[in-house]
Amino acid sequence: MFHKILSTLITVLTFFVVSTTAAQRPSPTPPTSHAQDEPITEDLSYGAMFKFTIAPDLPEFTFKVTPEPQKPDEYGNSHTTVRNVQVFRGDSKQPMQSLEDCEWEGMEAPPRGSDWFRAEDMNFDGYNDIYVLINWGATGNELGCVWLYDPKSSHFVFSKEFSELGRLTLNPATKTIATHSNGGMAGTIFRATKYVIEDNRPVPVVTVAQDFDFDKREYHCVVQQRRAGENALVTVRDGWAKPKGDFDAPCDASDPFRSIGDK
């Protein structure tokens, strides 16, 4: 009888210990998605520094970004932007200038990993210029500030005309600039413009503008082009079309200049 009671007591104690240990063991941590934790904006809290070659016969230029601190959002995305950019020539410890006249106050924190601060030959004169992305969005539309390098003064000069171009693509082979703005409806509402450089300014030579009339349920596409010997743009196409399918538009947003001469 005694042995039976002892055996039962040991069984109960063993069950109690096992149950207590299991209760104290931490539950497995659910897997987390690292993609959700990744910020979508560049963290400029500590500033930034860029080095560019402007021309083969010039020393390297350094651009030092002073940050404008802002609190991150609830998802951890940095909202710090630019307060000032100092420019250094070669090994000089003294800045030769600051990049002026851009409205830094309205700047958005740039996309993480983007080429938001870059040197490109915007006016095709053999000298790289400076582009800084100021605004951007999910539609792909962009707005930046541009400073053209002036070889006479050896300084970077703000260009209002180039800064108003929006999202742009340079074509050094044809020395043209193509811009594109997205108005919605899967990109079928858009405006695309091609520019040449005259008197150090972008001059439009072709525009393709497409909209959608919700009353008529039709797309409206207008193409304007500058003719030889003329300065003004003239309308070469003005068409309406009902979409045969979803977002089936008369002008192709992916290649708006395809059917236009001197592409």
Regions found by a protein language model. Name each.
Residues S19-N84, T176-K263:
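Acidic, small-residue rich beta-repeat scaffolds with periodic aromatic anchors
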Residues F61-V65, D121-I134, K175-H180:
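Acidic/hydrophobic-patterned starts of short beta strands in beta-sheet-rich repeat architectures
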Residues R83-P110, S153-T169, T176-A178, V206:
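Blade-edge motifs of beta-propeller repeat domains
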Residues W136-T139, G184-A186:
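Short glycine/acidic-enriched loop and turn motifs that connect beta-strands
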Residues S7-V17:
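Bacterial N-terminal signal peptides
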Residues M1-I5:
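Positively charged n-region of N-terminal signal peptides that target proteins for export
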Residues M49-T53, R112-M122, L165-T176:
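Beta-propeller blade termini
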Residues F88-D91, N141-F158, K194-D199:
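Beta-propeller blade repeat segments, especially FG-GAP/WD-type strand-to-loop junctions
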